[in-house]
């Protein structure tokens, strides 16, 4: 009997290595595929691509599977990195890992795998896929502390129908145990952290290679200038470190946080205190939406939402602003409790219990007490939010 072929995305890490081993043990015809998504010729100090490939080959030899490398660097720069720079240039804080999953790991990679006569692809992500009544649902992982459905929320029915997440039912501690028991050479390798193409280098240094500095005033909510920023692109909402005000004696003496950006005047607004009103939001508008089921929830639907990775689901209600658009490009969320540092450019991802429904890119979040709203890069969407209320 012909074995079903599964192409596994292998990164050189423990998770994808155990994924490949598990599928081989289950009787699949497993082929490993190593994706090179970044040209790192000048980045040897920070990028680990060469060592990662060595680890992949070592693991493949141990478990007895074929492996190949494919270069998606051109696709990555065109579909992911270019958008990353555009968003930062506009004063927002994007999440390239979300776009990478949708455009590279589950599009370019999936297409390549199908050219190898694969029936399915698999990755080491911590999430689950469930088929019910001919439709595919994206579920949180059994190990909620490692759940990665937030990064996968833009996957569609066609992609999920061809995808396996073997680690979705396994706690991370068990994955490490398996790696050690079968003698994987990378069993003790540290998990990768941060944005894949930046590695361990200082983020500001990396960004400055592509975006110029553009100094401007740093102001308090009452308009007082208390410093100078190096460029709005280099700061994000809720940021505390690296704003140059650690020793300031002004105000209450509490820590300073980035609270807003005014693109028109190139002004960075900072506030004192973690719970300052300008850092708290109960409503947001998100655009560039994507729904796992292909359609949005009903207006007024009660759900949970994350506005950043690892955040606990926050209770909220879903709305569809009347923006004169028939394609459902935007939605609003009204939270039961105020959310901290909701950041334009990040993803707002919706959940119905364990089920990930999809989400969109945050464009605007209403902040402040009545009559006090912080300037924002997406201030043009304030009217849309008013319609959503």
Swiss-Prot record:
| EC number annotated for this UniProt entry | 2.8.1.13
Q: Where is this region: Interaction with target base in tRNA?
A: 95-97
Span list, region Interaction with tRNA: 146-148, 308-309
Mind listing the GO molecular function terms for this protein? Answer: ATP binding; tRNA binding; tRNA-uridine 2-sulfurtransferase activity
Cited CDD domains: MnmA_TRMU-like
Primary localization: cytoplasm
Annotated active site residues, numbered on this chain, are 100, 196
Record's subcellular location: Cytoplasm
Q: Which family does it belong to?
A: Belongs to the MnmA/TRMU family.
| Name under which the protein is recorded | tRNA-specific 2-thiouridylase MnmA
Name of the coding gene = mnmA
């Amino acid at each position: 009997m012909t074995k079903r072929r599964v192409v596994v995305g292998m990164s050189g890490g423990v998770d994808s290595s155990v994924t490949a081993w598990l599928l081989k043990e289950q009787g699949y015809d497993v082929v490993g595929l190593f994706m090179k998504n970044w040209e790192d010729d000048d980045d040897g100090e920070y990028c680990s691509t060469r060592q990662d490939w060595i680890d992949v080959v070592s693991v493949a030899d141990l478990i007895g599977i074929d492996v190949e490398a494919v270069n998606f660097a051109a696709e990555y720069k065109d579909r992911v990195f270019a958008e990353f720079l555009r968003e930062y240039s506009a004063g927002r804080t994007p999440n390239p890992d979300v776009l990478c999953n949708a455009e590279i790991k589950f599009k370019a990679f999936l297409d390549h795998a199908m050219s190898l006569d694969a029936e399915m692809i698999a990755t080491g992500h911590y999430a689950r896929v469930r088929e019910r009544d001919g439709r595919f649902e994206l579920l949180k992982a059994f190990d909620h502390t490692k759940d990665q459905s937030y990064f996968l929320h833009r996957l569609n029915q066609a992609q999920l129908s061809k995808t396996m997440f073997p680690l979705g039912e396994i706690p991370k501690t068990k994955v490490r145990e398996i790696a050690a028991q079968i003698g994987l050479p990378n069993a003790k390798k540290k998990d990768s952290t941060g944005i894949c193409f930046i590695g361990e280098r200082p983020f500001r240094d990396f960004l400055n290679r592509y975006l110029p500095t553009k100094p401007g005033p740093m102001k308090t909510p009452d308009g007082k200038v208390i410093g100078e920023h190096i460029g709005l692109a280099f700061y994000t909402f809720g940021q505390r470190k690296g704003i140059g005000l650690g020793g300031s004696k002004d105000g209450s003496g509490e820590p300073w946080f980035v609270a807003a950006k005014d693109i028109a005047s190139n002004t960075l607004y900072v506030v004192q205190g973690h719970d300052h009103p300008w850092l708290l939001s109960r409503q947001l508008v998100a655009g560039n939406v994507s729904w796992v089921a292909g359609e949005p929830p009903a207006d007024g639907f009660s759900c949970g939402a994350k506005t950043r990775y690892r955040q606990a689901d926050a209770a909220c209600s879903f709305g569809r602003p009347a923006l004169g658009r028939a394609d459902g490009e935007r939605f609003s969320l009204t939270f039961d409790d105020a959310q901290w540092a909701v950041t334009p450019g990040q993803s707002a991802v919706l959940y119905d219990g364990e089920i990930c429904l999809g989400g969109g890119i945050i464009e605007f979040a209403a902040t402040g007490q009545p009559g006090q709203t912080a300037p924002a890069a997406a201030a043009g969407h304030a009217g849309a939010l008013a319609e959503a209320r």
